[in-house]
């Protein structure tokens, strides 16, 4: 017998029981985005490889070790997108959306990184990202954070996430700090693990977010990035903190927060949780004022964030037992006897016409009435609509409330109004 073909490791199927909660969460996220005036943009899953090398940085872990890259039949190097910002910027430049314009954009979809699969971290994962172009001030940074805070409240998880902030300054300020940090690390190389030694010269700021406790203790005595910030970056960060204080958004300044992608400058932030174990970051982002020009456009201030949906779903399930997922089916049509099957089909169609938001399922494939009621219960229906030979002949329907067992017989013409009342 042929061996079953299974999903690729780290790339998961999401079954109907899973997608119901995903859809509910996504609808809340999209509603909030709409309320802030953001518009959806959809980009390809596959991009030219140089896009990510130029945007993310050739010596980052993402580019060096995690990208799914291949040559097409024309010999062109292509990559499954590992993140969404680079593609969004590319699309904005290509279609003339960015120059001398303000844009508030969002996107949602699968991303791909070759990582070791674990809870909340997969090789195919889903992100929702938001990007703002054309606004240089700290006020838009604050609005993005307020937007995310509104999400957490709507999802019932605000008390389980904490905001961490930092400013990594300008490119010139980071260059000066990088030199001082490398000099410090060279004096303590015996404390560094192999990963930190590898990063020490290629991407030394990433040593700051090492999970090694010995390295973290060493960094207590390292030069502080805040001491190297340019004056404009200091003022920008102070302005952001002031706005968050006025909006009563609690936060912690984490001077070791640097983010793993090279395009960031000034503001960086993360929403973290301790409710999911080691995988603590739920949402992260920051400012990337140089990226548009770096990818061939005109200099354009920009800021944004991305959120892993797998991790968000896990968090909602872990901490909000009251989170409600709408039933898949409101009403289930049960039929028995000659002529009842076609009558059931037509009844369901007429109810869909009368109540466009009604979720109604018709029993097909036969089965006695008891089995049909079992199917109605299994799909979570609130109401059963029963048609037998006598009901078909009399143009009537038996309407049964599956929660309390009460039932009544109505004329078919009255069923829509009764359902609207029962289902609210």
From Swiss-Prot:
GO biological process: histidyl-tRNA aminoacylation
Domain of life assignment: Bacteria
Subcellular location: Cytoplasm
Reactions listed under catalytic activity: tRNA(His) + L-histidine + ATP = L-histidyl-tRNA(His) + AMP + diphosphate + H(+)
Keywords tagged on the record: Aminoacyl-tRNA synthetase, ATP-binding, Cytoplasm, Ligase, Nucleotide-binding, Protein biosynthesis
EC numbers: 6.1.1.21
InterPro entries (UniProt xref): aa-tRNA-synth_II, aa-tRNA-synth_II/BPL/LPL, Anticodon-bd, Anticodon-bd_dom_sf, His-tRNA-ligase, HisRS-like_core, HisRS/HisZ, HisRS_anticodon
HAMAP family xref list: His_tRNA_synth
Subunit structure: Homodimer.
Family: Belongs to the class-II aminoacyl-tRNA synthetase family.
Protein name: Histidine--tRNA ligase
Gene of this entry: hisS
